[in-house]
Amino acid sequence: MTLILPKDYRPTLTVRDTEAAIVFIRETFQDKLASILGVQRMSAPMFVEQKTGLNDNLNGVERPVAFDMKAMPKEDTIEIVHSLAKWKRLALKKYGFGIHEGLYTNMNAIRRDEDLDNFHSIYVDQWDWEKIIRKEERNTDTLEITVNKIFRAIKETEKLVSARHPGSTYRLGDHVSFITTQELEDRWPDLSPDERENQIAKEEKVVFIMKIGDKLKRSGKPHDGRAPDYDDWQLNGDLVFWYEPLQSKIEISSMGIRVSEESLKEQLKKAHCEERAKLPFHQMILKGELPYSIGGGIGQSRLCMLLLGKAHIGEVQASIWPEDMVEKCEADNIELL
């Protein structure tokens, strides 16, 4: 847990003004996202049955919040979602979406094992979206075009927020640069993946870091962990901004083209979890029963934090924080909700 305390921090908005700005950002951005990406708002679950394999296993070590239900057998464990990465692809089929059609949801999750800092909370709120593509569109061009559309939605939201709250909006970069995790390792082999991200974000201001999950050539280790059963590790990435108030990068979106039957087999083998292939969701992919798709998540609280120049995500969402973090934040004029 690393807490960054910016020197001489003074919020420019009161708590009530901040809350009003949060509402405006959320409503504005989701309208922009729906229009620019061509996706439809859909209702989504907060929990799923463990046996379906629909929950996001993240890096494979995080424990989901799990419980049983009075109306179901005790052995049928229910889990609060970590994300809706797999559910969305299934929903595209279930609800009859066609080529280049898609959905977005308001996703709320609990990640009990999250390492807490200025950007990370156990409460996760994001716009989760998913869109059907053709198999031949599973390529880098499709990925980069989609990233630029999401960035356009963010920039258009920034402009409107700035007009509404002049002097209280953080100025973003004007374009997205693209780089792979291997290119980062080749350029800075002696730095950690996190340090490389900070370096490239500071240089470029806005960068999409591609190909996350597979082992890198020099270190033999992944740049970062990714579950093997939703993103194709060769066609995914993170949208990262340089955030001057904290002298740090901030990840706003993780997204990617989803696994095909071929890449699912390959990635399950690399991750040493081939037993997952027996789960219903995975069987549908392997049998070609689910549409090819691209999708991702966009952090709601993080976007609000970024656009409003806040020092801690707890200024734009209500969560629980360790007592020592609360005390340090109070001493630095950071008011956690």
Swiss-Prot record:
Sorted UniProt keywords: Amino-acid biosynthesis, Asparagine biosynthesis, ATP-binding, Cytoplasm, Ligase, Nucleotide-binding
A GO BP entry: L-asparagine biosynthetic process
EC number: 6.3.1.1
GO molecular function: aspartate-ammonia ligase activity; ATP binding; catalytic activity, acting on a protein; transferase activity
Compartmental location: Cytoplasm
Presence of keyword Amino-acid biosynthesis: yes
GO CC, alphabetical: cytosol
Catalytic activity: L-aspartate + NH4(+) + ATP = L-asparagine + AMP + diphosphate + H(+)
Pfam families: AsnA
Metabolic or biological pathway, per its Swiss-Prot or TrEMBL entry: Amino-acid biosynthesis; L-asparagine biosynthesis; L-asparagine from L-aspartate (ammonia route): step 1/1
Family note: Belongs to the class-II aminoacyl-tRNA synthetase family. AsnA subfamily.
Name assigned to this protein: Aspartate--ammonia ligase
